[in-house]
Amino acid sequence: MLVLFFGTGLKAQLPSPSYPPRLVNDYTGTLSASQISTLERKLVAYNGSTSTQILVLLVDDLQGYSVEQYATEIGHSWGVGQKGKNNGAVILVKPKKGSERGQVNISPGYGMEEYVTDATAKRIIEKEMIPSFKENDYYTGINNAVNVIMDLCSGKFSQDEYADGDGFPLWLIILFIIAIMVVFSKFSGGGQNYSGGGTRTIWIPMGGGFGGGGFGGGGHSGGFGGFGGGGFGGGGASGSW
């Protein structure tokens, strides 16, 4: 009974969704108002076009939970994502304060785990987030992670491609292949001269490397309508610095 009561007390200390509900909830004062607004617009627009909900939460105190438990409990109790689809994700950040280490967790809902596996979540944390957090730039780290998660879910690149993303960007590889094809076609043209016949223009997508695009959301109007009842199973990854 004592253990049950204590566990219930812990859960009672978790924050409730704000009203009106928001996808960016900074209880630490770390992000500026403009940074919160920019992230919120992006996440609301993405939710509006895909129904996928990515919650960003910053807290100073984990209330006795591990960072993994805290993120999973928030995702489940707030109902991040849509019921039946379970297409939600929680990005939880406990900023570094004084001698206390900073902690971060990415927890995908059941329906997101095929796009953001535990290994991919760990890579996002180590590659996109912690380097910026160490420079006290929380906005860039969070924004980079959001962009990568959106791009993975939209199929802009696969998890394997993201894992190999430390090499050449995909668009540069495509450009290189096209250049080789153009040169090869000219030298195998059966003695045709290179003058006349017009000039073809080849359009190359200049999307840049992973995580740079994301979802703009500038054309979306209206606010966030609320969470949809998604479920979480405890997957994801954590990191600290």
Indicate residue ranges for each PLM-predicted region:
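Low-complexity, glycine/proline/serine-enriched intrinsically disordered segments
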Residues: 12-13, 113-114, 118-122, 126, ...
